[in-house]
């Protein structure tokens, strides 16, 4: 009897760990690489203390996006900027450096996210002397600050962690959705307002702020001789009207800077489709049959215009625990779309980054996290155990269906 128990023990132990994603023998990212795209997820500074989560990132992903720590409102140092002798902004990279350093040391490439985003941006950045009690600065001053900021941030990470940051979301969410948020007749739907508040980049840099940001980024990348792609990133990018506006914006950016040979410099390499799929805060609109084909068509549409495509913040929303199997099948269908896109004739999709990696059933109903990612939208459960969604996606990537 003891001999039987001893023989069975390794099998029992294997069964016990098989439900944990960090113990899978072959990572999902290695399987995705067979189909020509990276597989990514996200990381917050607080998660740097969660070793199990870090182990899952190392096991299954080869790209990581910092949720907030590489954004301007995190990097900018108000007090130091006010004291800067040259009048240029000062950044504090402590948190971001720790995270990018971890990624480098563990073999993950980094999506830089994001250089210019009007939402949550520090108001003081736009004032004379960085002092909110002073008037807003003039256009030339704000443009110089932004050029300096973009140059310094890209340069910092490339020189400190060479080759680790492989792309940047240069501008985030500059295309508005609703009438009144953009000027009538503007095919780009360039955002003037967000929830009633002014887009301060547009207001104080001008209508060319997106193109200027890409120009500043392109100049920096070329000066560094770095292999870094430059992306425009937005939500709802697979809906027809939004996609048309994004394409109009991309065309305006890529016809902005003459190349000296009668053409234009290509400033924007690609489009990041955020990939929040389903209703915001509600099951209505979730797991709808038509979305996978819409996503496929949008990716091909961007690719046909010479733009690379990444899915940058994917959350396959599900607010009902009872829909777990349907959610898993839906996730698998999305990955069937992704794996079929890249062929020897073309490679339109180069990364899929999953934002809602884990379930979060304790998120308060109506909260931002609950509404954005949904409580049951993960590949993993709240204890980081694998769900049917994980296994079905794995099967698609393996070709084991």
Where are the language model's segments positioned?
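Sec-dependent signal peptide cleavage junction
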Residues: 15-23
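Boundary/entry segment of secreted carbohydrate-active catalytic domains
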Residues: 22-63, 67-69
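Substrate-binding cleft and catalytic face of glycoside hydrolase catalytic domains
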Residues: 29, 59-80, 86, 91-237, ...
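Bacterial N-terminal signal peptides
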Residues: 8-15
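Glycoside hydrolase catalytic-domain groove-lining segments
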Residues: 93-94, 98-101, 105, 203-233, ...
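Short, acidic/polar
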Residues: 44-60, 146-156, 242-258, 295, ...
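Aromatic-rich peripheral "rim/lid" segments of glycoside hydrolase catalytic domains that contact
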Residues: 25, 76, 142, 156-160, ...
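Acidic-and-aromatic substrate-binding clefts and catalytic sites of carbohydrate-active enzymes
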Residues: 41-54, 73-76, 81, 87-94, ...
């Amino acid at each position: 009897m003891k001999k039987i128990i001893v023989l069975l023990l390794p099998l029992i132990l294997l069964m016990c760990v098989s439900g944990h994603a960090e113990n899978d023998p072959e990572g999902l990212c290695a399987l995705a690489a067979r189909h020509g795209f990276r597989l990514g997820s996200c990381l917050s500074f607080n998660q740097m203390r969660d070793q199990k989560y870090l182990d899952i990132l190392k096991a299954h992903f080869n790209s990581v996006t910092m949720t907030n720590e590489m954004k301007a409102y995190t990097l900018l140092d108000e007090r130091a900027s006010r004291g800067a002798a040259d009048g240029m902004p000062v950044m504090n990279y402590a948190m971001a450096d720790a995270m990018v350093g971890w990624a480098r040391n563990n073999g993950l490439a980094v999506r830089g996210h994001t250089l210019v985003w009007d939402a949550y941006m520090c108001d003081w950045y736009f004032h004379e002397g960085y002092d909110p009690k002073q008037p807003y600065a003039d256009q030339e001053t704000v443009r110089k600050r932004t050029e300096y900021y973009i140059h310094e941030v890209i340069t910092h990470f490339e020189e400190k962690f060479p080759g680790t940051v492989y792309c940047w979301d240069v501008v985030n969410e500059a295309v508005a959705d609703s009438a009144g948020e953009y000027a009538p007749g503007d095919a780009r739907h360039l955002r003037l307002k967000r929830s009633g508040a002014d887009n301060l980049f547009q207001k104080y840099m001008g209508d060319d702020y997106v193109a200027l940001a890409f120009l500043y980024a392109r100049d920096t990348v070329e000066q560094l001789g770095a292999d870094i792609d430059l992306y425009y990133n937005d939500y709802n990018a697979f809906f027809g009207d939004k996609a048309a506006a994004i394409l109009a914006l991309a065309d305006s950016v890529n016809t902005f800077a003459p190349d000296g040979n009668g053409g234009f410099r290509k400033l924007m390499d690609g489009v990041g489709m955020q990939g929040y799929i389903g209703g915001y805060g509600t099951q209505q609109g979730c797991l709808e049959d038509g979305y996978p084909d819409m996503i496929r068509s949008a990716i091909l549409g961007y690719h046909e215009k010479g733009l690379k495509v990444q899915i940058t913040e994917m959350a396959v929303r599900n607010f009902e625990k009872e829909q777990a199997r349907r959610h898993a099948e839906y996730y698998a269908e999305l990955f069937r779309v992704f794996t079929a896109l890249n062929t020897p004739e073309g490679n339109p999709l180069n990364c899929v980054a999953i934002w809602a990696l884990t379930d979060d059933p304790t998120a308060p109903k109506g909260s931002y996290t609950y509404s954005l990612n949904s409580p049951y939208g993960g590949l993993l459960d709240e204890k980081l155990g694998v769900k049917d969604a994980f296994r079905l996606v794995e099967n698609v990537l393996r070709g084991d269906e």
